Amino acid sequence: MKSVFYILVLLAAASGLRAQTTLRIRGSDTLGAKLVPQLAEAFKKNGGKISFDIAAEGSSTAFTNLAAGTAEIGMSSRKVKADERALCRAKGVKLIEFEIAWDMIAILVNKNNPVSDLTKKQVLQIFAGDIKDWSEVGGTPGPISLYTRNTSSGTYKDFIDRAMKGREYGKNSQKMAGNEQIASEVGSNVNGVGYVGLAYVGSKGTKVVTIEGVMPSVATVKDYPYSRPTYLYTNGEPVGTTKEFINYCLNPVGDEIVGKVGFVPKTAAKQIR
């Protein structure tokens, strides 16, 4: 019996050592493809003695991993849903939320598309599949090719809520794994349209359309219709290196990195809003 106790102690020690040397972060592609890796690199350069294991596979995976104990931090481009919170609670996980930055969902079209502005109603109708040809919104005749995120993405559902009044995407929409894939498809297809986070605008062959005259930018975060906060989540109040990294992300240095990557720093968003 005593030997079993010692084995358990050793296993616990090994688990604690891993938590101190490797920080596992799972979830949102919007946050995990650019922002969080750059925050992680800056944290290490400033003396953070930790390695990072970051997987950006969609916001929903933040909560499945936290529930399973396979992540110390979850990244999400939306608030946790009720069923995700219930899953975590059932596993004994108490979610703590940290607002890390503001994002803006930008509508991308091909740079050769003459359409430069859309109304909110037109955006809804395009992504719901009601408007099927660019000539219906003043563009060159041609069938609209629609690109969205996949169902594990927080942006997938967030866009339905913010831009589509709860309606589903058109049947011909093509689901992409990440922002960069959407930008690539739109950039190579003159009839393409999709959405990306603010940090992914300016991709080759694409341009951003204004929404009722408003271009997504730090200055328009209050007025742009598809602005949203983004979050990090932990299981309970963070401790140790997890706490150190969270604090780094939320301090002025972290806020500066947020802005450089292309997101809206939370301090700037708070002042404007």
Regions found by a protein language model. Name each.
Residues 19-273:
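Exported/periplasmic ABC-transporter solute-binding proteins
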Residues 4-13:
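Sec-dependent N-terminal signal peptides
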Residues 15-17:
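N-terminal export/targeting leaders of redox proteins
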